[in-house]
């Protein structure tokens, strides 16, 4: 008999997962998927295919209707200390400075002031926001607000980041720059990342794997391994390999849209 060790357990495992609502609408049906430690998996698919719902199931924010979700071998509820969730809206408190927004979680946990200050400073440095620590959200650009939101998520030292269209509201150049910064942090911190986007180009640039969901009900239609070298930079987007993978993903994505 082989005993499953902690190292052999997938970081995230969904086994026959379905999500139904009281009005009988089916958001997801029969999702089976494993994600290993350190993977960057991005979800693409039509609106309403359950991409955001899937992240909520993994985080424990919403219960499954059928099947099961395990995070590092635990239920999502028991694994919450491992997870940080980053939403499309930065949701910074307007009456708090950047550093006080970033440190809010530690403050609520009654962390010691010196330790909190040191960790907040470290996170702001990681996302290149040390120079605006004393500013308020209204004084920040959209890109700065999102970097502050990422810093706030990192303060808890997560192993897993769940990111639901975090850069969707930003202009293309800002989004590209933040994608590059995110990958720099990803390579340094060795997180496991689940990312939702509607941009094929963004999905290919960021990911080790792209999962395409079909809708009505939401289900896995295709999985694509992204074979692009690391580190990924602005020059990656100019490569033939990148263009080929974007073309492949775009073709498969078109196939799941219903006429």
Predicted regions and their residues:
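The feature captures the beta-strand-to-loop junction immediately N-terminal to the Walker
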Residues: 44-46
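Conserved ABC ATPase "signature" region
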Residues: 103, 107, 114-131, 184
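Helix-to-loop junction immediately C-terminal to a conserved catalytic motif
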Residues: 59
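Short coil-to-helix segment of the ABC ATPase nucleotide-binding domain corresponding to the Q-loop/switch region
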Residues: 96-103
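Conserved signature/switch motifs of ABC ATPase nucleotide-binding domains
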Residues: 135-138, 156
